[in-house]
Design a protein with these regions (language model features):
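Bilobed "Venus flytrap"/periplasmic-binding protein-like clamshell domains
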Residues: 1, 53-115, 119
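Sec-exported extracytoplasmic/periplasmic mature domains
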Residues: 2, 20-24, 94-98, 118, ...
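Second-shell loop/turn segments in exported
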Residues: 3-6, 16-17, 44, 74-82, ...
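Solvent-exposed, acidic/flexible segments
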Residues: 8-12, 47-51, 69, 78-86, ...
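Residues embedded in well-ordered beta-strands
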Residues: 56-58, 185, 192
Length: 254
Protein backbone atom coordinates (compact mmCIF):
# COMPACT_ATOMS: atom_id res chain seq x y z
CA UNK A 1 0.00 0.00 0.00
CA UNK A 2 0.88 3.68 -0.09
CA UNK A 3 1.34 5.77 3.03
CA UNK A 4 0.76 9.52 2.74
CA UNK A 5 2.34 11.70 5.42
CA UNK A 6 1.45 15.40 5.47
CA UNK A 7 4.12 17.72 6.83
CA UNK A 8 3.47 21.29 7.97
CA UNK A 9 5.68 23.97 6.42
CA UNK A 10 6.18 27.73 6.28
CA UNK A 11 5.42 27.80 2.56
CA UNK A 12 6.94 27.44 -0.90
CA UNK A 13 10.54 28.27 -0.05
CA UNK A 14 10.66 25.70 2.75
CA UNK A 15 8.97 23.12 0.54
CA UNK A 16 11.58 23.69 -2.16
CA UNK A 17 14.44 23.34 0.33
CA UNK A 18 12.99 20.05 1.60
CA UNK A 19 12.74 18.61 -1.89
CA UNK A 20 16.35 19.57 -2.61
CA UNK A 21 17.71 18.34 0.74
CA UNK A 22 19.20 14.86 0.27
CA UNK A 23 18.70 14.14 3.98
CA UNK A 24 14.98 14.95 3.84
CA UNK A 25 12.54 12.24 2.75
CA UNK A 26 9.98 14.64 1.23
CA UNK A 27 9.07 13.39 -2.26
CA UNK A 28 6.26 15.72 -3.35
CA UNK A 29 5.35 19.29 -2.38
CA UNK A 30 3.41 22.35 -3.48
CA UNK A 31 5.61 25.17 -4.77
CA UNK A 32 4.38 28.56 -5.97
CA UNK A 33 5.40 29.26 -9.57
CA UNK A 34 8.27 31.74 -9.69
CA UNK A 35 9.68 30.67 -6.32
CA UNK A 36 12.42 28.49 -7.84
CA UNK A 37 13.81 31.24 -10.10
CA UNK A 38 17.61 31.16 -9.83
CA UNK A 39 17.70 27.86 -7.88
CA UNK A 40 19.32 24.66 -9.20
CA UNK A 41 16.34 22.32 -9.49
CA UNK A 42 17.66 19.67 -11.89
CA UNK A 43 16.53 16.82 -9.60
CA UNK A 44 12.91 18.02 -9.56
CA UNK A 45 9.98 17.69 -11.96
CA UNK A 46 6.66 19.49 -12.29
CA UNK A 47 3.53 17.35 -12.14
CA UNK A 48 1.48 20.34 -13.29
CA UNK A 49 -0.39 23.38 -12.03
CA UNK A 50 -3.21 22.81 -9.52
CA UNK A 51 -4.80 26.23 -8.93
CA UNK A 52 -4.26 29.99 -9.00
CA UNK A 53 -2.77 31.78 -5.99
CA UNK A 54 -3.65 35.42 -6.75
CA UNK A 55 -1.70 38.39 -5.45
CA UNK A 56 -3.88 40.73 -3.41
CA UNK A 57 -2.50 44.19 -2.68
CA UNK A 58 -4.57 45.89 0.00
CA UNK A 59 -3.94 49.45 1.16
CA UNK A 60 -5.39 52.13 3.40
CA UNK A 61 -6.42 55.62 2.34
CA UNK A 62 -9.07 57.47 0.40
CA UNK A 63 -7.11 57.77 -2.85
CA UNK A 64 -7.58 54.99 -5.38
CA UNK A 65 -4.28 53.40 -6.44
CA UNK A 66 -3.68 51.17 -9.46
CA UNK A 67 0.13 51.05 -9.80
CA UNK A 68 2.77 49.69 -7.43
CA UNK A 69 4.92 52.78 -8.05
CA UNK A 70 2.30 54.69 -6.05
CA UNK A 71 3.43 52.82 -2.92
CA UNK A 72 6.72 54.73 -2.71
CA UNK A 73 7.13 56.23 0.74
CA UNK A 74 4.72 53.70 2.27
CA UNK A 75 5.10 51.01 4.91
CA UNK A 76 4.56 47.77 2.97
CA UNK A 77 4.15 44.29 4.48
CA UNK A 78 5.86 42.09 1.88
CA UNK A 79 5.84 38.69 3.62
CA UNK A 80 7.98 36.95 6.20
CA UNK A 81 11.70 36.41 5.62
CA UNK A 82 12.30 33.39 3.39
CA UNK A 83 8.69 33.15 2.19
CA UNK A 84 7.54 32.79 -1.40
CA UNK A 85 5.28 35.81 -0.84
CA UNK A 86 8.28 37.98 0.00
CA UNK A 87 10.29 36.79 -3.00
CA UNK A 88 7.52 37.56 -5.50
CA UNK A 89 6.47 40.81 -3.80
CA UNK A 90 10.03 42.16 -3.89
CA UNK A 91 10.36 41.09 -7.52
CA UNK A 92 7.30 43.12 -8.53
CA UNK A 93 8.22 46.11 -6.38
CA UNK A 94 11.75 46.16 -7.81
CA UNK A 95 10.30 46.20 -11.33
CA UNK A 96 8.45 49.36 -10.29
CA UNK A 97 11.48 51.05 -8.74
CA UNK A 98 10.28 50.49 -5.17
CA UNK A 99 12.91 49.22 -2.72
CA UNK A 100 14.10 49.60 0.85
CA UNK A 101 15.43 53.08 0.06
CA UNK A 102 12.07 54.37 -1.16
CA UNK A 103 9.70 52.46 1.16
CA UNK A 104 9.65 50.66 4.50
CA UNK A 105 9.48 46.95 3.60
CA UNK A 106 8.07 45.10 6.60
CA UNK A 107 8.81 41.35 7.06
CA UNK A 108 5.18 40.54 7.84
CA UNK A 109 2.87 38.04 6.16
CA UNK A 110 -0.53 36.40 6.51
CA UNK A 111 -2.69 37.38 9.47
CA UNK A 112 0.22 39.28 11.05
CA UNK A 113 0.28 41.57 8.01
CA UNK A 114 -3.51 41.92 8.17
CA UNK A 115 -3.31 43.02 11.81
CA UNK A 116 -0.59 45.54 10.93
CA UNK A 117 -2.75 47.08 8.19
CA UNK A 118 -5.86 47.17 10.37
CA UNK A 119 -3.85 48.63 13.25
CA UNK A 120 -2.37 51.37 11.02
CA UNK A 121 1.13 49.92 11.46
CA UNK A 122 1.35 49.27 7.71
CA UNK A 123 0.00 51.23 4.75
CA UNK A 124 -0.19 48.30 2.32
CA UNK A 125 0.13 44.51 2.37
CA UNK A 126 0.93 41.82 -0.19
CA UNK A 127 -0.99 38.57 0.24
CA UNK A 128 -1.10 35.45 -1.91
CA UNK A 129 -3.99 33.01 -1.66
CA UNK A 130 -7.55 32.23 -2.67
CA UNK A 131 -10.43 34.60 -2.04
CA UNK A 132 -11.53 32.25 0.74
CA UNK A 133 -8.32 32.49 2.78
CA UNK A 134 -8.92 34.05 6.20
CA UNK A 135 -6.34 36.80 5.64
CA UNK A 136 -7.77 37.89 2.29
CA UNK A 137 -11.38 37.49 3.43
CA UNK A 138 -10.93 39.72 6.47
CA UNK A 139 -9.54 42.58 4.37
CA UNK A 140 -12.15 42.30 1.61
CA UNK A 141 -14.74 43.18 4.26
CA UNK A 142 -12.63 45.66 6.27
CA UNK A 143 -13.69 49.30 6.41
CA UNK A 144 -11.18 51.84 5.14
CA UNK A 145 -9.20 49.18 3.24
CA UNK A 146 -9.03 49.05 -0.57
CA UNK A 147 -7.99 46.31 -2.99
CA UNK A 148 -5.66 47.51 -5.73
CA UNK A 149 -6.69 46.78 -9.32
CA UNK A 150 -3.37 46.48 -11.16
CA UNK A 151 -3.30 48.55 -14.35
CA UNK A 152 0.04 46.92 -15.28
CA UNK A 153 -1.25 43.34 -14.87
CA UNK A 154 -0.88 42.45 -18.55
CA UNK A 155 2.67 43.80 -18.55
CA UNK A 156 3.54 41.71 -15.48
CA UNK A 157 2.15 38.57 -17.12
CA UNK A 158 4.37 39.14 -20.16
CA UNK A 159 7.51 40.08 -18.23
CA UNK A 160 7.17 37.26 -15.69
CA UNK A 161 6.15 33.92 -17.30
CA UNK A 162 5.09 32.47 -13.94
CA UNK A 163 2.30 35.05 -13.58
CA UNK A 164 -1.16 35.08 -15.16
CA UNK A 165 -3.54 38.03 -15.49
CA UNK A 166 -6.87 37.46 -13.73
CA UNK A 167 -10.11 39.38 -13.33
CA UNK A 168 -12.09 39.32 -10.11
CA UNK A 169 -15.60 40.21 -11.33
CA UNK A 170 -17.73 42.80 -9.57
CA UNK A 171 -19.78 41.10 -6.85
CA UNK A 172 -17.95 37.76 -7.16
CA UNK A 173 -17.07 37.64 -3.45
CA UNK A 174 -20.44 38.85 -2.14
CA UNK A 175 -23.26 39.86 -4.50
CA UNK A 176 -25.48 41.11 -1.67
CA UNK A 177 -22.85 43.60 -0.49
CA UNK A 178 -21.38 44.03 -3.99
CA UNK A 179 -17.83 43.01 -3.06
CA UNK A 180 -15.80 43.99 -4.95
CA UNK A 181 -17.74 47.03 -6.12
CA UNK A 182 -16.04 46.90 -9.55
CA UNK A 183 -14.05 44.45 -11.68
CA UNK A 184 -10.55 44.11 -10.21
CA UNK A 185 -7.51 43.09 -12.25
CA UNK A 186 -5.01 40.88 -10.42
CA UNK A 187 -1.95 38.80 -11.25
CA UNK A 188 -1.39 35.29 -10.03
CA UNK A 189 1.29 32.64 -9.80
CA UNK A 190 0.08 29.05 -9.75
CA UNK A 191 0.47 26.31 -7.18
CA UNK A 192 2.71 23.70 -8.80
CA UNK A 193 2.82 20.07 -7.71
CA UNK A 194 6.54 19.27 -7.67
CA UNK A 195 8.11 15.83 -7.28
CA UNK A 196 11.64 14.56 -6.76
CA UNK A 197 13.06 12.57 -9.69
CA UNK A 198 13.04 9.43 -7.52
CA UNK A 199 9.22 9.46 -7.17
CA UNK A 200 7.74 6.21 -8.54
CA UNK A 201 5.67 6.57 -11.76
CA UNK A 202 2.73 4.74 -10.16
CA UNK A 203 2.65 7.33 -7.37
CA UNK A 204 2.71 10.13 -9.94
CA UNK A 205 -0.37 8.64 -11.61
CA UNK A 206 -2.24 8.35 -8.30
CA UNK A 207 -1.36 11.92 -7.32
CA UNK A 208 -2.58 13.31 -10.63
CA UNK A 209 -5.83 11.34 -10.49
CA UNK A 210 -6.46 12.72 -7.00
CA UNK A 211 -5.59 16.24 -8.18
CA UNK A 212 -8.07 15.90 -11.03
CA UNK A 213 -10.83 14.89 -8.63
CA UNK A 214 -10.12 17.76 -6.22
CA UNK A 215 -9.09 20.67 -8.46
CA UNK A 216 -11.08 20.30 -11.68
CA UNK A 217 -14.19 22.17 -10.50
CA UNK A 218 -14.99 25.76 -11.46
CA UNK A 219 -14.11 28.64 -9.15
CA UNK A 220 -14.03 32.42 -9.08
CA UNK A 221 -10.96 32.47 -11.32
CA UNK A 222 -11.01 29.13 -13.12
CA UNK A 223 -13.21 27.35 -15.62
CA UNK A 224 -14.35 23.72 -15.12
CA UNK A 225 -11.54 21.36 -16.06
CA UNK A 226 -8.91 24.11 -16.29
CA UNK A 227 -6.87 22.41 -13.56
CA UNK A 228 -4.80 20.38 -13.09
CA UNK A 229 -2.82 21.06 -16.25
CA UNK A 230 0.73 20.64 -17.50
CA UNK A 231 3.02 23.50 -16.60
CA UNK A 232 6.77 23.97 -16.43
CA UNK A 233 7.63 27.60 -15.70
CA UNK A 234 10.23 26.57 -13.11
CA UNK A 235 10.61 22.81 -13.50
CA UNK A 236 10.56 20.46 -16.51
CA UNK A 237 7.30 18.55 -16.82
CA UNK A 238 7.62 14.95 -15.65
CA UNK A 239 7.37 12.49 -18.59
CA UNK A 240 4.82 10.51 -16.54
CA UNK A 241 2.75 13.66 -15.99
CA UNK A 242 3.02 14.56 -19.67
CA UNK A 243 1.59 11.14 -20.58
CA UNK A 244 -1.23 11.64 -18.09
CA UNK A 245 -2.25 15.01 -19.56
CA UNK A 246 -2.12 13.63 -23.10
CA UNK A 247 -3.76 10.24 -22.56
CA UNK A 248 -5.44 10.23 -19.13
CA UNK A 249 -5.37 7.22 -16.83
CA UNK A 250 -3.16 4.23 -17.71
CA UNK A 251 -4.97 1.75 -19.99
CA UNK A 252 -5.36 -0.92 -17.28
CA UNK A 253 -7.14 1.56 -14.95
CA UNK A 254 -9.82 2.61 -17.44
Amino acid sequence: GIELREQPSAGSMENLKRLLDEKDDTEVALVQSGTANGVNVETLFSLGYLYYEPLWVFYRGGRELDRLTQLKGSRIAVGAEGSGTRKLALQLLEANGVGDKSAALLPLGGLTAVEALQGSKADAVFLFGSGRSSAVWSLLYAEGVRLMSLSHAEAYARLFPHLARLTLPQGAIDMTRNIPHRDVTLVSPMATLVAHESTHPALVQLLLQAAQEVHSEAGIFQRPGEFPRGGQADFPLSPDAERFYKSGKPFLQR
